[in-house]
Amino acid sequence: MPEGPEIRRAADNLEAAIKGKPLTDVWFAFAQLKPYESQLTGQLVTRIETRGKALLTHFSNGLTLYSHNQLYGVWRVIDTGEIPQTTRILRVRLQTADKTILLYSASDIEMLTAEQLTTHPFLQRVGPDVLDARLTPEEVKARLLSPRFRNRQFSGLLLDQSFLAGLGNYLRVEILWQVGLTGQHKAKDLNEAQLNALSHALLDIPRLSYTTRGQADENKHHGALFRFKLFHRDGEACERCGGIIEKTTLSSRPFYWCPHCQK
């Protein structure tokens, strides 16, 4: 499943295609959304926001389209008039004069008012987004040490979107390697230096992945700069210590680690 950096880059691509352009045609597959087709035609997409793995498409009339891709949903950008060759089921079409964005296969789609945005169940549960530039390491550290999270093992905590939105499995692996910790640790057991290092890594690594083009190839590189240190590299030598990277399962997900330098 795509993680925060990939979701944000997808949103960037959608924004680049249609932001600020009048919508010439709007289509929804679900009956409960049909009344909004006419309301949105002629409106502008003002921005596309990410909250973890959810997308919020904001329109100039104050409405917001909430969509969560879950496992199978995917957005596509096409030239207006193009007919894509796909077996996927179309759910949403937002068309402008030159570009059209399409949402396929997703089922978690809603139209929200500004007031409903503040009470939506998923948006209420989800934690601060690691790609939100306003989020600081100090705030992350306070969150780690809060009663809600301080007793949680990192193996599960770093997959929990209510802790920090946008994290996922490859980020969990890379963050824990960066700070030299295994997934069994808890925030309450770390010393000050470890807490500070983890608080920074929880923001620095997702942001590096995003700025260097996200998950381009799971085995190789995140664009030009971001390269997996451990993920999908079991059996290879750890570049920090020379130990052999191992693969196991933590919280029902594949986990890669170096037994020699992660303690």
From Swiss-Prot:
Active site: residue positions: 2-3, 53, 253
Keywords: DNA damage, DNA repair, DNA-binding, Glycosidase, Hydrolase, Lyase, Metal-binding, Multifunctional enzyme, Zinc, Zinc-finger
Pfam families in the cross-refs: Fapy_DNA_glyco (PF01149), H2TH (PF06831), zf-FPG_IleRS (PF06827)
Binding site residues for DNA: 70, 125, 169
Matching HAMAP family: Endonuclease_8 (MF_01253)
PANTHER family the record matches: ENDONUCLEASE 8
Protein name as annotated: Endonuclease 8
Organism per entry: Salmonella typhimurium (strain LT2 / SGSC1412 / ATCC 700720)
Recorded name of the encoding gene: nei
